[in-house]
């Protein structure tokens, strides 16, 4: 059984999660999660990964406009940006590119820790219903 961006949103896995761009990509399957802050080695990003970031890398609009198309071309499932550290909202250039490419961008509030994100997502992705592994295997 697969787990998708749609599932993440509609099962309310993380409170106050918002889909802000790339709505047409909600069917993208999530097979893994990756916490990233510096995307200087995009070849280390795998297809069907859901990226979590504080948005540090996106502060410099001109330098990083190419990242959304690059991530979409690598078949990344989508990106979740934790607002409140480096970004208070998702920049318009990111929303526009993500919508054009059906690349989902979601936001979570600052009070949801990456530790909580990893624990919850690993439970989901490695649950008996998804892969045959159980929580005790983690």
Regions found by a protein language model. Give the residues of each.
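Alpha-helical/coil-rich non-catalytic "connector" segments in signaling and regulatory proteins
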Residues: 1-138
């Amino acid at each position: 059984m697969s787990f998708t961006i749609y599932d993440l949103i509609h099962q309310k896995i993380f409170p106050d999660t918002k889909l802000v761009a790339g709505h047409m990509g909600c069917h993208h399957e999530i097979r893994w999660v990756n916490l990233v802050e510096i995307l200087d080695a995009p070849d280390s990003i795998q297809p069907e990964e859901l990226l979590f970031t504080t948005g540090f890398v996106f502060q410099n609009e001109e330098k990083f406009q190419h990242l959304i198309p690059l991530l979409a071309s690598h078949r990344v499932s989508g990106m979740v940006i934790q607002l409140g550290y480096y970004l208070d909202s998702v920049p318009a250039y990111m929303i526009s590119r993500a919508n054009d490419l059906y690349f989902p961008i979601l936001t979570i509030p600052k009070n949801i820790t990456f530790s909580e994100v990893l624990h919850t997502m690993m439970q989901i992705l490695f649950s008996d219903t998804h892969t045959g592994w159980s929580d005790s295997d983690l």
